[in-house]
Structures are given as structure tokens and as C-alpha cells.
């Protein structure tokens, strides 16, 4: 199960990113983190930008409300999303 932490302005959760995947999609769950694949390579922040776009679309929030709180240059990241609750995130991840 993915660990989603409530913050004062939204939520945060761990992501394990797989750059250069065959398609941009949810791959599954790995050690409490959401495992995602993006087709972009990890060059010049392209994989990070693809991750932000994908998560924003998945959770139906603006791109500006999604930030990488930790792990800019790592496959293991912490994503922060403003303006949503943990319950909303869980619901939208189940629908996907």
C-alpha cells in the first residue's frame, strides 16, 4: 500500500521512477512507493517534467500544484501535491 502523508497544504508520497519506459504509466507499488514509468530519458530534467505532467493529469490537478520535494536526481522521489487530501489521491489512484 502506498504511504500518503497529509501536509498542511496537501499531501506527499514516495515515487519510484523508471525513465525510458515503453509507455508512461503506473507500473505498481514498491516498498510503500508508487512505481511509475515515463518514456522520457533522465536528461536535462525531462523525466522529472514528464513525471509532474503525468501525476497532475492522473490526479486532475494543475501542473503547478505538483512538485518534487526530494530526489530531483534520483529514481526515488517524494512528490508534494497542493490542494488535495489523501482520500482524494487514494480514490483517483484506485480509479486508474
Swiss-Prot record:
SMART domains: DUF167. GO terms for cellular component: cytoplasm. It comes from the Bacteria. It holds the Pfam family DUF167. HAMAP family: UPF0235 (MF_00634). Belongs to the UPF0235 family. PANTHER family: UPF0235 PROTEIN C15ORF40 (PTHR13420:SF7). NCBIfam families: DUF167 family protein. This is UPF0235 protein Acid345_4205.
Amino acid at each position: 500500500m502506498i504511504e500518503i502523508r497529509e501536509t498542511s497544504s496537501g499531501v506527499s508520497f514516495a515515487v519510484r521512477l523508471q525513465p525510458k519506459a515503453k509507455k508512461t504509466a503506473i507500473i505498481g507499488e514498491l516498498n510503500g512507493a508508487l512505481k511509475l514509468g515515463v518514456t522520457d530519458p533522465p536528461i536535462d530534467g525531462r523525466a522529472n517534467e514528464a513525471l509532474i505532467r503525468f501525476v497532475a493529469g492522473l490526479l486532475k490537478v494543475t501542473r503547478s500544484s505538483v512538485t518534487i520535494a526530494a530526489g530531483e536526481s534520483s529514481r526515488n522521489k517524494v512528490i508534494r501535491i497542493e490542494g488535495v487530501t489523501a482520500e482524494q489521491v487514494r480514490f483517483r489512484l484506485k480509479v486508474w
